[in-house]
Amino acid sequence: MAKATAKKRKVIVESTGEAHISSTFNNIIISLTNKKGEVIAWSSAGKMGFRGSKKNTPYAAQMAAEDCSKVALEAGLKKVKVYVKGPGNGRESAIRSIHNGGIEVTEIIDVTPMPHNGCRPPKRRRV
């Protein structure tokens, strides 16, 4: 039986879109979407070949953002509104490298979820 080839889905790319940067303590994930939220390009520190503690570095975030913005720029994205979520290291360097990649950053919004005293946090590490 012949192997089914994966069909690449068509995403309508407008000149303006959104960049979602999810920065955790372990990894950073960057998604560039159109206004509807359909993903144009995505990248992460793990996808770029970083492993372990190297994934949570500003350099890894920079490399992931460069890779992502290059693909989106070729697709036709020109301006983005950046949504940043999480406490990780590479937030600023990811925004800076999206801007240096040729995509204009119009707005930066922090959407980090803050509990109104919800779940008990994990215990403090003693090293």
Curated annotation (Swiss-Prot):
Listed Pfam families: Ribosomal_S11
Keywords: Ribonucleoprotein, Ribosomal protein, RNA-binding, rRNA-binding
Coiled-coil spans in chain: none
GO CC annotation terms, alphabetical: ribonucleoprotein complex; ribosome
Keyword field contains RNA-binding: yes
Position of the signal peptide: none
Gene3D superfamilies on file: Ribosomal protein S11
A GO BP entry: translation
An MF annotation (GO) of this entry: rRNA binding
Record-stated family: Belongs to the universal ribosomal protein uS11 family.
PANTHER family linked: 40S RIBOSOMAL PROTEIN S14/30S RIBOSOMAL PROTEIN S11 (PTHR11759)
Subunit structure, interactors included: Part of the 30S ribosomal subunit. Interacts with proteins S7 and S18. Binds to IF-3.
Function: Located on the platform of the 30S subunit, it bridges several disparate RNA helices of the 16S rRNA. Forms part of the Shine-Dalgarno cleft in the 70S ribosome.
Name this polypeptide is given: Small ribosomal subunit protein uS11
Source organism of the structure: Flavobacterium johnsoniae (strain ATCC 17061 / DSM 2064 / JCM 8514 / BCRC 14874 / CCUG 350202 / NBRC 14942 / NCIMB 11054 / UW101) (Cytophaga johnsonae)
Upper classification of the organism: Bacteria, Pseudomonadati, Bacteroidota, Flavobacteriia, Flavobacteriales
